[in-house]
Amino acid sequence: MQFHERFDVIVVGGGHAGTEAALASARMGSKTLLLTHNIDTLGQMSCNPAIGGIGKGHLVKEIDALGGAMAVATDFAGIQFRTLNSSKGPAVRATRAQADRALYRHKIQEILQHQANLRIFQQAVDDLVVENGKVVGVVTQMGLAFEAPAVVLTAGTFLGGKIHIGLENYSGGRAGDPPAIALAHRLRELPIRVGRLKTGTPPRIDANTIDFSQMTEQKGDDPLPVMSFIGDVNDHPEQVSCHITHTNERTHDIIRGGLDRSPMYSGIIEGIGPRYCPSIEDKVNRFADKTSHQIFIEPEGLNTTEIYPNGISTSLPFDVQLNLVRSIKGMENAEIMRPGYAIEYDYFDPRDLKNSLETKTIAGLFFAGQINGTTGYEEAGAQGLLAGMNASLQVQGKEAWCPRRDQAYLGVLVDDLSTLGTKEPYRMFTSRAEYRLLLREDNADLRLTEKGRELGLVDDNRWALFSEKMESIETELQRLRGQWVHPNSPLVEALNPHLNTPITREATFEDLLRRPEMDYPKLMSIDGFGPSLEDQRAAEQVQIQVKYSGYIQRQQGEIDKAIRHETTLLPLDLDYQEVPGLSNEVIAKMNEHKPETIGQASRISGMTPAAISILLVHLKKRGLLRKSA
């Protein structure tokens, strides 16, 4: 049965990748269909009730700078906000919010339902329609066929999903949801490499059975951070505390005693789990010398008693879960509301993707989220936005776009995946970026919003606010550079007590702000140096740009040098056997990874500078040297 309308872009899946993909495509004017197995779970936070963190918060800010929904929804749902690494430099500071699951889901659904050009339809997808190497539509569970020249798959953990609790297992996409078995079988027929990964979640605890007085309270920040560049602290709901407790030797003995019934340690689970979010049984086994592990006791919302004990993800049998929970301080009488579990699922080798997230073998088919081997809401949302945007660009006959590694963490994420692939769930860290001094949370809008506007992702309201902020920053920087103070000036009497050494020569206000002991609020508080900018985010940007200008210029020089050949394209039909001087090892690596640019090739493990030089000489001789857009 054929659906009565044709669409430009179809998005399959309504998680964090799917919602951002659908919204991006629709914002750009493409007639978009979002297909989900359950409209009520659109925007569902399947695992931990939190958004942001180190590296992840940077991605959220980038999604926001490109007009995405994640940060906006977090501001309306965040019940505790903290700035991590606040005592360190701005490059590694990160915003993290504890979120009310229901409020977050409702806000995402509200944004989806009010988005022009977007249709939502509830049906699971069982089949892709591919003709002559190009996707032309999908077929749902009930046999309903939808046509579109571009399809974005964001299936999360649903592809061949299998849930494990102890030695028992059953098919599922997540607890309470069916898996996508037919679609998984169909995708395995495609010429794309497939593997299995694993992730897990902890048991949920009833707050009424926890003694919080035995734990350490962890409050949010004051003043409260805001996640979105267009957000307001007044959007935040009621704020609550989290708590901290620890496992102990008794907990570890209980876990060790249950390992013979662990699906991980009995060989039942084949998939590889996330290195940076291991299960508690994995932590106890791998770090046998540690006598305790920290657990964050996180509320799941304002109107629920469910607690998420972050740090004890497990797939041990229920009786072992209950005993280990009750061995922890403050949880001696705890009751489990939902058992923890592990889930195995299919993922596809991201090296088979272009950096637009379109598959290399099937035109018009895009993958985003956990299907590409990543873990985390933020990584999924960022990929979803990029895939939805590029699907829309393709339908409009325009060239694909992906930020470079020096432009965005999103660029780092996609380049890592499409060049190197992954054999374990990939998560973002600031350490993955070579140019993190330039890729800060605070300047994500300065880096990306103008490009987002050009692409059609950024609406008039966001653009007006951004333009106003940019004007404020530029005007204030010009003022600081143009105002001078002389050692004999009347201003010096009020200024010198704030300086480590009195000024002995004429200096601009910018020179004074650059001093280590001075900051923008302090300088503006001194008579004659104000007025200060009212917009605190613009004021922060002024301070950072002045304080770090030397380091930023140095890093920009490094980028300019590296970028000279970064975007030099490698022809897709280039036969590396015909390139004189390449070793068999390099030829094998190039054929395996199929890099699109010299930059991607240079990051393949084992690739030598000599091999890159040989490639460049070959391209030049053949007249094939050209850059990507």
Swiss-Prot record:
FAD binds at residues 13-18. InterPro entries: FAD/NAD-bd_sf, GIDA_C_N, MnmG, MnmG-rel, MnmG-rel_CS, MnmG_C, MnmG_C_subdom, MnmG_C_subdom_sf. NAD(+) binds at residues 273-287. One of its GO terms (molecular function) is flavin adenine dinucleotide binding. The keyword tRNA processing applies. GO terms for cellular component: cytosol. It is found in: Cytoplasm. Pfam families: GIDA, GIDA_C_1st, SAM_GIDA_C. Its main location: cytoplasm. SMART domains: GIDA_assoc_3 (SM01228). One of its GO terms (biological process) is tRNA wobble uridine modification. Keywords: Cytoplasm, FAD, Flavoprotein, NAD, tRNA processing. The keyword Protein biosynthesis does not apply. Its cofactor is FAD. NAD-binding protein involved in the addition of a carboxymethylaminomethyl (cmnm) group at the wobble position (U34) of certain tRNAs, forming tRNA-cmnm(5)s(2)U34. Homodimer. Heterotetramer of two MnmE and two MnmG subunits. Belongs to the MnmG family. This is tRNA uridine 5-carboxymethylaminomethyl modification enzyme MnmG. The gene is mnmG.
